[in-house]
Amino acid sequence: KEDGYFVTGGTRIAVPEGKLNYLRAQGYINKDIILGIRPEDIHDEPVFINASPETSVKCQIEVAELMGAETMLYTSIEGQSIVARIDSRSDIKPMDTLQLGLDLNKAHFFDKETEARIRP
């Protein structure tokens, strides 16, 4: 973690100011932390990604599982597995590469050593 960004490998993801303030206040800048985000808070819509490009990541889809009204996408960021739940109208197949936008306003951060949630 560096000031203003969650960093994993070569990927930098901007942290919203509100979350950044409580991470700073509790001394978590430049410390290892865990980022948790629910599948429904990961988006493939261009309008979301364009509005917040610093919270989007490029991924290669490993599995795309159509589940009726939604599709579950399985991929990874710098070796860390993630799952995204997107609208089934998106025609995404395994091995496709796409940008996914992370809604970090809804993300949770955890202390790497204790695995306890870092609360505001």
Regions found by a protein language model. Give the residues of each.
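Short aromatic-glycine-enriched beta-strand elements
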Residues: 3-5, 68-74
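Glycine/charge-rich catalytic "coupling/switch" loops of P-loop NTPases
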Residues: 3-5, 9-62, 81, 90-120
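C-terminal helical cap and adjacent loop that interface with cofactors, partners, or active-site loops
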Residues: 65
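Canonical phosphoinositide-binding patch of PH/PH-like domains
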Residues: 84-85
